[in-house]
Regions:
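Aromatic (phenylalanine/tyrosine) cluster motif
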Residues: 18-22
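C-terminal amphipathic alpha-helical interaction region
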Residues: 429-467, 471
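Substrate-recognition/cap regions that form aromatic- and gly/pro-loop-enriched pockets
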Residues: 350-432
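Sequence-structural signature of the catalytic-core scaffold of metal-dependent phosphohydrolases
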Residues: 16, 31-57, 69-80, 89, ...
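Long, amphipathic alpha-helical stalk/connector segments used for oligomerization, subunit docking
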Residues: 319-369
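Polybasic, lysine-rich low-complexity intrinsically disordered segments
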Residues: 5, 10-13, 28
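Acidic, low-complexity proline/glycine-rich segments
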Residues: 63-75, 369-373
C-alpha cells in the first residue's frame, strides 16, 4: 500500500509538472505569434484616456489620412527633392507627388490583401481587417515626412556632420545612445518623432494618430545602437518608450532580451508600406529619367516590357500602337508594370502570412516575388544606379545639400549652446517657438536644431543659407 501511495504521488507530481510546462509553452507560443485583432487598433496615441468609438462616416484610419493631407509638414513635401532637382520646364517627382503615389499603391495592396485574408479567415469578419487599405494608405502618406531637404543626401549630410565633421567635437558630451542617434540620423526615425513628439505648445501625442498607422511606418523597429552599416533604425532614444508602448499594445513580438538595445519584429503592414515605396520610386524614377532624356525611349520601353508574360505582351503592344504620344506610351507601360508588381507582392504576403505573423519573414516582399518579375525589377534597379542616381544633376543636388545643411547645423548648434551671444540671439529668433532650443540637455538642444532643419524645404534652406552668408538680402 505504501509503494502504491508513493507511486500515485509521483504520478500526480509529474502530471502537475507536465501541465505547468505545457502551459508555459502555450504562453510562450501565444506571445511569439501576432494576431490581426490586436494588430489593428484604432486607439489614438496621446488620447488613450479619451478613446471613444465614433459612429460616423469616416473611420479612424481615414481620419489619419485626412489629418496628414491637411498638415503643414505634408504640404512642405511639395518643395523637397525626391531624386532629381525640383522642376524647371520639365516636371518630375518631388516628395509630395511621390508620397501621394505611394499612398495609392499602398491602398491597392492593402485592399487586395484584406480581401484575401478575410476569405482565408472568415472568423475575422468582425475585426478591422477590412480597413488595412486605409491604414497602409495613411502610413504611406507619412513615410517621408521626416526626410530633410535635398533628398537622401540631406540625411547623409546630417549624419556625417557628427561622424566626420565639426560635430565630432560633441561626442564626449553625449551618451553612447545619443551619439548613435546623431551619427546615424534617419528619415524614418525622424518621421516617427514628428508624428508622436509633443512639440512646444502642441497637444500630447503629436499628430495623435492611431496606433496601427504609427506602427506601420516603423520600417526598422530597433534602436540606433543596432543601426549597423546600413545606417537604418526606427526611433530615436527620445521616442523609444513611445514605440515600446505602441508595440506592447498591438502585441508586436519583442526580439531583444532585457538589458539589450531594443528590437521588435515588424508590424505586418510595414511590409506593404515598404513594397508600395519600392514599387513607386523604382517605376517612377525610370519614367522621370526618360522625360529628362537620361534614358532613351528604347531603353525605357525595354525595362518596362520585361514585367509582362508573352500573352500579356501581345495586348500591351496592341494598345501602344493606338497611342501616338511617346510619353503616353511610357506612362501606360509604367502603369501596367505597377499593376504586375502589386499583384506579385500581394501573393507573396498572403503566401507568407504565417512567417510574417511570427516575425521570421526576412527581407522586403519585392525580394520574394517570382523570378521573372524579380529579375525585371532588379534590372530597373541596376539601370537606376548606373545611369540615374549618378547623373550630373543628381550629384549636383547632393553637393549643394551637403554644403547648405552642414553650414546651417554648425551655426544653429553653436547658437543653442551659447544662446547669450549676440549672433546666437539673431539665429534663435528665426526658429519657430515649437522647437525646444532651450531644452535642459545638450541632446535635447541638438534635436531641436535637427527638428528645425529637417522640417525645411529645399528652397527655404537655400534661402536661409544665402542670407546667413550675406549672398542674399530681403527686398527693401
Amino acid at each position: 500500500d505504501l509503494h502504491k501511495t508513493i507511486s500515485k504521488l509521483k504520478t500526480k507530481k509529474l502530471t502537475h509538472l507536465f501541465v505547468f510546462i505545457f502551459s508555459l509553452s502555450l504562453q510562450k507560443l501565444s506571445q511569439s505569434v501576432m494576431n490581426w485583432k490586436q494588430l489593428i487598433s484604432n486607439k489614438r496615441f496621446g488620447l488613450e484616456a479619451l478613446h471613444e468609438i465614433r459612429k460616423e462616416d469616416r473611420t479612424e484610419f481615414q481620419r489619419d489620412y485626412d489629418r496628414l493631407i491637411f498638415s503643414a509638414p505634408f504640404r512642405r513635401l511639395q518643395n523637397k527633392t525626391q531624386v532629381f532637382p525640383l522642376p524647371g520646364s520639365i516636371f518630375v517627382h518631388n516628395r509630395l507627388t511621390h508620397s501621394l503615389e505611394v499612398s495609392c499603391v499602398g491602398r491597392s495592396l492593402g485592399n487586395d490583401i484584406a480581401a484575401s485574408l478575410l476569405q482565408k479567415h472568415p472568423e475575422l469578419s468582425d475585426s478591422h481587417l477590412s480597413e488595412i487599405g486605409a491604414i497602409v494608405s495613411a502610413a504611406c502618406l507619412a513615410h517621408d515626412l521626416g526626410n530633410p531637404p535635398f533628398g537622401h543626401s540631406g540625411e547623409k549630410a546630417i549624419g556625417t556632420y557628427f561622424s566626420e565633421g565639426k560635430g565630432l567635437a560633441l561626442k564626449p558630451l553625449l551618451s553612447e545612445a545619443e551619439w548613435e542617434d546623431l551619427t546615424h540620423f534617419e528619415g524614418n526615425a525622424n518621421a516617427f518623432r514628428l508624428l508622436t513628439h509633443q512639440f512646444e505648445g502642441r497637444r500630447p501625442g503629436g499628430f495623435v494618430m492611431t496606433y496601427s498607422t504609427l506602427a506601420s511606418i516603423v520600417k526598422y523597429p530597433f534602436s540606433s545602437r543596432l543601426a549597423g552599416k546600413k545606417q537604418k533604425f526606427g526611433f530615436f532614444l527620445s521616442e523609444e518608450e513611445d514605440y515600446k508602448r505602441i508595440a506592447e499594445e498591438l502585441g508586436i513580438i519583442k526580439l531583444s532580451k532585457d538589458g539589450e538595445p531594443i528590437r521588435y519584429a515588424r508590424h505586418p503592414l510595414v511590409y506593404l508600406v515598404e513594397a508600395a515605396d519600392d514599387i513607386c520610386y523604382q517605376m517612377m524614377d525610370i519614367e522621370d529619367a526618360h522625360k529628362l532624356k537620361i534614358l532613351t525611349t528604347q531603353e525605357t520601353k525595354e525595362l518596362y516590357l520585361q514585367f509582362f508574360t508573352e500573352s500579356r505582351l501581345k495586348r500591351i503592344n496592341e494598345i501602344c500602337k493606338l497611342v501616338a504620344d511617346t510619353n503616353e506610351q511610357i506612362a501606360y507601360l509604367r502603369t501596367s508594370a505597377i499593376g504586375v508588381l502589386i499583384k506579385a507582392c500581394t501573393q507573396v504576403f498572403v503566401d507568407n502570412e504565417e512567417d510574417i505573423l511570427n516575425g521570421t519573414f526576412e527581407g522586403p516582399l519585392i525580394k520574394h516575388m517570382d523570378k521573372p518579375i524579380r529579375q525585371a525589377y532588379e534590372n530597373c534597379s541596376k539601370t537606376a544606379f548606373a545611369k540615374i542616381y549618378c547623373s550630373k544633376d543628381v550629384l549636383d543636388i547632393e553637393l549643394a545639400g551637403y554644403q547648405v545643411i552642414t553650414t546651417l547645423i554648425d551655426l544653429m548648434i553653436e547658437a543653442v549652446r551659447y544662446p547669450d551671444k549676440a549672433y546666437s540671439k539673431l539665429l534663435i529668433n528665426r526658429v519657430s517657438k515649437q522647437y525646444e532650443v532651450h531644452a535642459p540637455t545638450l541632446y535635447g538642444k541638438i534635436q531641436a536644431v535637427l527638428d528645425y532643419i529637417s522640417g525645411m524645404t529645399d528652397v527655404y534652406a537655400l534661402d536661409l543659407y544665402r542670407k546667413i552668408n550675406g549672398n542674399s538680402l530681403p527686398a527693401v
